[in-house]
Amino acid sequence: MKASLFAVIFGLVVLCACSFAEDQFASPNELLKSMFVESTHELTPEVEGRYCQKWMWTCDAERKCCEDMACELWCKKRLG
């Protein structure tokens, strides 16, 4: 009787531990996926029909930052 009770309790503990571990390993992947999915919306059309770069996008003469951004290797919000 004690062995079967121990087996049931041990099974529940293992099941909970596996579920918790699965959640822990899934969370970073979901975070990365959400970062990349959200980053696809960072480009916004300019008046001329070209796209401007938003915050943390690399910029140069061809890839200009949006109007409220300043280009310093990547686009940063203008202060002031």
Curated annotation (Swiss-Prot):
Probable ion channel inhibitor. Shows insecticidal activity when injected into mealworms. The keyword Disulfide bond applies. The lineage of its organism: Eukaryota, Metazoa, Ecdysozoa, Arthropoda, Chelicerata. The modification Leucine amide is found at L79. GO terms for molecular function: ion channel regulator activity; toxin activity. Expressed by the venom gland. Belongs to the neurotoxin 30 (phrixotoxin) family. Residues 1-21 form the signal peptide. It is found in: Secreted. SUPFAM superfamilies: omega toxin-like (SSF57059). This is U4-theraphotoxin-Spl1a. The presence of a 'disulfide through disulfide knot' structurally defines this protein as a knottin. The keyword Cytoplasm does not apply.
